[in-house]
Amino acid sequence: MNIDDKLEGLFLKCGGIDEMQSSRTMVVMGGVSGQSTVSGELQDSVLQDRSMPHQEILAADEVLQESEMRQQDMISHDELMVHEETVKNDEEQMETHERLPQGLQYALNVPISVKQEITFTDVSEQLMRDKKQIREPVDLQKKKKRKQRSPAKILTINEDGSLGLKTPKSHVCEHCNAAFRTNYHLQRHVFIHTGEKPFQCSQCDMRFIQKYLLQRHEKIHTGEKPFRCDECGMRFIQKYHMERHKRTHSGEKPYQCEYCLQYFSRTDRVLKHKRMCHENHDKKLNRCAIKGGLLTSEEDSGFSTSPKDNSLPKKKRQKTEKKSSGMDKESALDKSDLKKDKNDYLPLYSSSTKVKDEYMVAEYAVEMPHSSVGGSHLEDASGEIHPPKLVLKKINSKRSLKQPLEQNQTISPLSTYEESKVSKYAFELVDKQALLDSEGNADIDQVDNLQEGPSKPVHSSTNYDDAMQFLKKKRYLQAASNNSREYALNVGTIASQPSVTQAAVASVIDESTTASILESQALNVEIKSNHDKNVIPDEVLQTLLDHYSHKANGQHEISFSVADTEVTSSISINSSEVPEVTPSENVGSSSQASSSDKANMLQEYSKFLQQALDRTSQNDAYLNSPSLNFVTDNQTLPNQPAFSSIDKQVYATMPINSFRSGMNSPLRTTPDKSHFGLIVGDSQHSFPFSGDETNHASATSTQDFLDQVTSQKKAEAQPVHQAYQMSSFEQPFRAPYHGSRAGIATQFSTANGQVNLRGPGTSAEFSEFPLVNVNDNRAGMTSSPDATTGQTFG
């Protein structure tokens, strides 16, 4: 196709030269430069006035044809056509600029290539482009189908403005309307509804829906664990298990609770946390809302109920009202707002959702009857010794404000409350030593306040329950001041009950107290711990007990136990025994203490001790004093040895703690004028050394002593108790007994209620009691199988 044919076709399509000229210029003006239609009309009028004749254009074409034919051999046909049109367009552009007015020349200074592209547009090509544009959306949709993996990521906007999910998956399940990309995924999903499990394990007959589940299960039988932890070397069947395990090393917690924003390392722990905390929280909030609605309806109906007639206490009603107001606010929110605002209700849950439990725990604490008074309470209640009582005391909210002031006034461990006791049950028994130490520092004003009665309680409260509890507290106040975590001997009860008088309950004396140690000059009771002056070592006493209990004489079943409280005919001297002093000598006593009550108490106590002493020593000729006297010891207690010197007394006071720490059988002491006799166990034939004179031992011969004991044994119809002897105990432990005590070198041993005082030989201090062999004079005293090795008084 040459240039002539192309030009002829172009002229025929355009229809006229004038029309062609104007159309080309209009394309340049409107399509490229963007001028208005007014400028386009002006350009058409100028071109129509100065149009070129048809012959000039043909002559120009011939000149171009001759010049281009020379280069046809060197240039290809396509390049030749482009070059020809470019030259032609340049010539026409120059002519147009010359003929147009000066104002339109700048608007026509545009690239000619754009005009050329629009000029040579074919109709068939335009139709092809339209068809491609119609097919393009369908093709793009098919391509998106292939690339789409998860339909959950495609978001659509519904008519109401909410977001929805677009699921382009065509395979839909008939049971649950779930859509899948392929038929394979659909059929695998249908197995869940039908229950079909086509894949079976060859070893354990377990069946699975999918094949990879079967393959993963078979690794359990083969023991294959392909996934290994890099840090600790543990191996796992699944990769997920390994990744979950690695979080324990790294401390990563990727899962977060949507309510409280707490992080967890495993999904199951997140679910458990939601179930335990937040779901139960919602249920309790609903219950509280119902209760709050009932309470508000009662108040609106006009029923006036007193605080005691109301089923709920005041604090509980306040908490419930707070919850009901919170539930009214919650009811105005929808479910989406609830999830966002869960954190706002966390303080409500942590502080006051458990109404019932909080009322039981926070409102009540156990209060032991405390003593914030002086030493007069010990004297008033010396005869009454009760077991510790647990008193439920309702705590007032105002009491916590008075706590620092009360702690400054009294140092009693039970007169104040700690903060930890407010929110829980605090079962605390009275520490006797700390209580007695603090009693010496108490004020007299507090004594007066307590003696006045329930009209002025220690904690001034208008609550009726506090008043009732104060009456109970005053009832047990004296018992608490004389109690040291053991069941002591209740003298007042024993005096009024004959059955108990016949079988006196023995006192289990605590290690932290001594027996009947009261000062006569300064009567501020200060009982100090005896751990530092425990003169008999624990190892010595334990060895003694082991020797008694395991001696190879067929008596292994005899054991010494603290729990054995059925010890008859034994006298209990408690650490709070009152000395026999006149009221003028009682310096620390209260002015309001009744002397008549004290006299009655001492009289009952004396009667009981006299009866018990008569039963234990009714045939004892060495008990010269028929009356009962109380012990008054000197005030040099911490420096006083266990045995006093000989020039003062023959047998002085022996602290019970020196025997208690290593022995299971509790020792009892009997006050007799100015000393204690040693009385233990079940035997009614103990030997109290209870002469009135300090030289009573020299007045009696050894043979008379043995005759008296032998006749005493024969006169009773009671079976003879076996006395265990321990001769091997003398040598290794003689030094602690002999060196640490200033007047006696005897050995002590308890044998089923009897006391034997033994020594390695006749000592210089007690020449009146020589030691002889048992086989000479012991025929009527004991039936021990090891009589040849034991020694006793002769």
UniProtKB/Swiss-Prot annotation:
Name the InterPro entries on file.
C2H2-ZF_domain, Znf_C2H2_sf, Znf_C2H2_type
Query: Which residues does the annotated region (Disordered) include?
Result: 298-336, 574-596
Modification type Phosphothreonine: residues? 194
Sites of Phosphoserine modification:
51, 250, 301, 306, 412, 665, 784
Q: Does Chloroplast show up as a keyword for this record? A: no
**Signal peptide from the UniProt entry:** none
Protein name as catalogued? Zinc finger protein 148
Source organism (scientific name): Homo sapiens (Human)
Q: What is the lineage of its organism?
A: Eukaryota, Metazoa, Chordata, Craniata, Vertebrata
